[in-house]
């Protein structure tokens, strides 16, 4: 199987998000990379499902809460930006202050 760099990056996000969700299900609080991976994964999948950029920007702030992450993590993540593939092409999705 030959994957392009963009496809490899998406696959790494999926693996990181899966690991983070497993840790979360064990009751562990998420660290910075785990939180970013989950948010990124949910945004990419939302785009694939046909949601709009505006909808994803709003949805991105509801994926994780302060209770889900380690202390200080919300303050470390100011923006999450991902390039997602929508039915009408690739677009940049930016979520400001995603953990509230």
Swiss-Prot record:
Pfam families: Urease_gamma. GO terms for biological process: urea catabolic process. Keywords: Cytoplasm, Hydrolase. InterPro entries: Urease_gamma, Urease_gamma/gamma-beta_su, Urease_gamma_sf, Urease_subunit. It is found in: Cytoplasm. It comes from the Bacteria. Its EC number is 3.5.1.5. Heterotrimer of UreA (gamma), UreB (beta) and UreC (alpha) subunits. Three heterotrimers associate to form the active enzyme. This is Urease subunit gamma. It comes from Pseudarthrobacter chlorophenolicus (strain ATCC 700700 / DSM 12829 / CIP 107037 / JCM 12360 / KCTC 9906 / NCIMB 13794 / A6). The gene is ureA.
């Amino acid at each position: 199987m030959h994957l392009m760099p963009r496809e490899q990056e998406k696959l790494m996000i999926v693996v990181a998000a899966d690991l983070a969700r497993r840790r979360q299900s064990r009751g562990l609080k998420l660290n910075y990379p785990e939180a970013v991976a989950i948010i990124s994964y949910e945004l990419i999948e939302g785009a694939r499902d046909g949601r709009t950029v505006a909808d994803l920007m709003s949805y991105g702030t509801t994926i994780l809460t302060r209770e889900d992450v380690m202390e200080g993590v919300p303050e470390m993540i100011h923006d999450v930006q991902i390039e997602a593939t929508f039915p009408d092409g690739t677009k940049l999705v930016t979520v400001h202050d995603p953990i509230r």
